[in-house]
A protein has these predicted regions:
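Conserved small/polar residues in nucleotide/adenosyl-binding loops
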Residues: 218-219
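Hydrophobic transmembrane alpha-helices of multi-pass small-molecule transport proteins
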Residues: 42, 66, 105, 114-136, ...
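Specific alpha-helical transmembrane segments that line the substrate/conduction pathway
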Residues: 29, 35-40, 80-113, 153
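Loop-to-transmembrane alpha-helix entry segments
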Residues: 63, 92-95, 111-131, 140-147, ...
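Glycine-/small-residue-enriched transmembrane alpha-helix faces in small-molecule transporters
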Residues: 1-32, 38, 70, 74, ...
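Hydrophobic transmembrane alpha-helices of multi-pass small-molecule transporters
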Residues: 39-46, 99-107, 129, 161, ...
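Juxtamembrane helix-start motifs in multi-pass secondary transporters
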Residues: 30, 176-177
Length: 220
């Protein structure tokens, strides 16, 4: 059963990248749709069954969730943008370097260090990421820029993960996820409005693409 769950999770992440490349909407709008649909899907169970927990939230809880959502929104905007600028393989590999940023931040700010036996795997993964970036640098400036955007997305995801570690000590998964997804959607909406990117007019296919990514996420 665990293997099936892992397989579904990998399939969901992999196919979502393909959906982004397939879509014709701007990457910022696709990320906004993605987060808005996710927040809407989480709203029903949370508002129906977690009202007491929502009322008990402290100001600190809310601010941390808002900050976490801010960085999640940045992550998706960067990740989806990278998928348009570089190859799917490069974008996915470089975004997954999030673990390097988390390990570094944990050591610097939390005093947590990786066990020695895990360092060879980390260094091997880092070397692989460097090879990907070097290969893309030969492919042109656009691909290299996409790699840098993917790394920015990885850094944002790391901050989201670190803040989430703190939040999850007090909040249930459903409430935390709902608040973070809502914050991420609001962040992306603000970015779209400030950049003058139209919010609609991209056809139903792009909306279904974002909804399809959500379905893949929740089934995995």
């Amino acid at each position: 059963m665990k293997r099936l769950i892992v397989l579904l999770g990998v399939a969901g992440v992999s196919l979502s990248a393909v959906f982004v490349r397939w879509s014709t909407a701007p990457s910022l709008i696709l990320a906004l749709y993605r987060m808005a649909f996710s927040a809407a899907l989480m709203a029903v169970p949370v508002l129906a069954g977690r009202r007491r927990e929502l009322k008990s939230l402290t100001r600190r809880d809310v601010l941390l969730c808002l900050a976490s959502g801010l960085f999640l929104g940045i992550h998706f905007a960067a990740y989806f943008g990278a998928l348009r600028a570089t190859s799917i393989a490069s974008a996915v590999v470089l975004v997954d370097t999030e673990v390097f940023f988390v390990a570094a931040a944990s050591a610097l700010f939390l005093g947590q260090r990786l066990p020695r036996r895990t360092w060879p795997a980390v260094l091997l993964a880092f070397a692989g990421s460097a090879v990907v970036a070097l290969a893309d640098s030969a492919a042109g400036t656009n691909a290299l820029l996409g790699d840098l955007i993917a790394l920015a997305g990885a850094a944002a995801m790391a901050v989201y993960t670190m803040i989430g570690t703190v939040c999850r000590q007090r909040l249930s998964t459903s409430v935390y996820t709902f608040l973070v997804y809502t914050s991420a959607a609001a962040t992306l909406l603000a970015a779209a409005l400030l950049s003058g990117t139209p919010l609609a007019g991209y056809g139903p296919v792009n909306g279904l693409t974002a909804l399809g990514m959500d379905c893949l996420l929740y089934t995995s």
